[in-house]
From Swiss-Prot:
Part of the 30S ribosomal subunit. The keyword rRNA-binding applies. The gene is rps14. Binds 16S rRNA, required for the assembly of 30S particles. Belongs to the universal ribosomal protein uS14 family. It comes from Aethionema cordifolium. NCBIfam families: PRK08881.1 (NF006477). Its main location: plastid. One of its GO terms (biological process) is translation. SUPFAM superfamilies: Glucocorticoid receptor-like (DNA-binding domain) (SSF57716). This is Small ribosomal subunit protein uS14c. Keywords: Chloroplast, Plastid, Ribonucleoprotein, Ribosomal protein, RNA-binding, rRNA-binding.
């Protein structure tokens, strides 16, 4: 189980990313439309003004059961070992154990 403080920090980053998402997207569109380099630098400065934690690259996908940041399957939102336990307990419909 991940520490509660790390999970709360991740939730805070998600809120910041949602808050500044439109600002980042509009600034990127403006940069692509403007041909002059000096104007691009001005808009680039505006693009760097939001907080660092509002960047989408700083977000992790976490297991919603344990909060583990690594080995998380996108389809299920679970980490690998929790996914395996749930499949063995027949808690995930449609998921089967592989056998060959």
């Amino acid at each position: 189980m991940a520490k509660k403080s790390l999970i709360y920090r991740e939730k805070k980053r998600q809120k910041l990313e949602e808050k500044y998402h439109l600002i980042r997207r509009s600034s990127k569109k403006e940069i692509s439309k403007i041909p002059s380099l000096s104007d691009k630098w001005k808009i680039h400065g505006k693009l760097q003004s939001p907080p660092r934690n509002s960047a989408p690259t700083r977000l992790h996908r976490r297991c919603f059961s344990t909060g583990r940041p690594r080995a998380t399957y996108r389809d299920f939102g679970l980490s690998g070992h929790i996914l395996r336990e749930m499949v063995h307990a027949c808690l995930l419909p449609g998921a089967t154990r592989s056998s060959w």
